[in-house]
Amino acid sequence: MADVMRVAVAGASGYAGGEILRLLLGHPAYAQGRLAIGAVTAAASAGSPLGEHHPHLTPLAQRVLEPTDAAVLAGHDVVFLALPHGHSAALADQLGADTLIVDCGADFRLTDAAAWERFYGSPHAGSWPYGLPELPGARERLRGARRIAVPGCYPTAALLALLPAMAEDLIEPAVTVVAVSGTSGAGRAAKTDLLGSEVIGSARAYNIAGAHRHTPEIAQGLAAVSGRDVTVSFTPVLIPTSRGILATCTARTTAPFSALRAAYEKAYDAEPFIYLMPEGQLPRTGAVIGSNAAHIAVAVDEAAGVLVAIAAIDNLVKGTAGAAVQSMNLALGWPETQGLSVIGVAP
């Protein structure tokens, strides 16, 4: 391993790329000189100062965004790809096998080629180790890895909410997920339906009835721990806030609350970024903003025979950039929690 790890961020002008840079600037390896931020790249914004896009990143404000191409990214020890879906695969193929590539896009998340082609409409590029360390067995696959696929933000929330119950066979393999999210999850490109006048004071569902691209990813993660095919009904809802996801997940169960609570305590007791709420308390997005934490609550609707599991995360941290840095730490053999906080910014 190099004495100083040179890190590049492709797609640095976007929200995910900017959040990766924010976390890297606060990483102890950066403060100690063991991690250096190299190329920061963009597409249409290439040639402009990073500070025009992320004025909060003052230590890097004068950095000029370079074009996103393999020649610019070559020679770095770690490359974060924060690119639109479908753009990572070709670029990754041009980088060396020894380069740690952490892809925040969807290109390598799905193992099922047919599912990829159905939801994304292009040839499947393959799959990489999945960057959700809390998934059973994931840490072993991430340690020493040189290719990592960061999970989607909605799947992160839904999987963390449901994994313990599904892994212990305490719920039926048919789940419903309704998740509200802020506008940053849609990226930074200008869109009419994301204008302030369209979003403020309003909430709307979108990509309903199995149409959202994160649906097969949620099903894949649940199937991996249950050993059964899992059906997922997923409804995303856009709300007028910039950050945060609150996922309310339900599934049929005959298990008593005590058994379900015990399963969650067993699964998450030693997890550094998971906070299982005390009984009677419920997660809120405001408590996790800016942190890599996931706050989770579990309850049973006894009259309906339904598990209700709720997860709150910051979609830009635990849902993207934080998971990317957490996975980088594992891949490099560094303490998993370095550079990541469980303390949110409130109010």
Curated annotation (Swiss-Prot):
GO terms for molecular function: N-acetyl-gamma-glutamyl-phosphate reductase activity; NAD binding; NADP+ binding. GO terms for biological process: L-arginine biosynthetic process. Keywords: Amino-acid biosynthesis, Arginine biosynthesis, Cytoplasm, NADP, Oxidoreductase. The active site is at residue 153. Its EC number is 1.2.1.38. It catalyses: N-acetyl-L-glutamate 5-semialdehyde + phosphate + NADP(+) = N-acetyl-L-glutamyl 5-phosphate + NADPH + H(+). Signal peptide: none annotated. Pathway: Amino-acid biosynthesis; L-arginine biosynthesis; N(2)-acetyl-L-ornithine from L-glutamate: step 3/4. It is found in: Cytoplasm. Catalyzes the NADPH-dependent reduction of N-acetyl-5-glutamyl phosphate to yield N-acetyl-L-glutamate 5-semialdehyde. This is N-acetyl-gamma-glutamyl-phosphate reductase. The gene is argC.
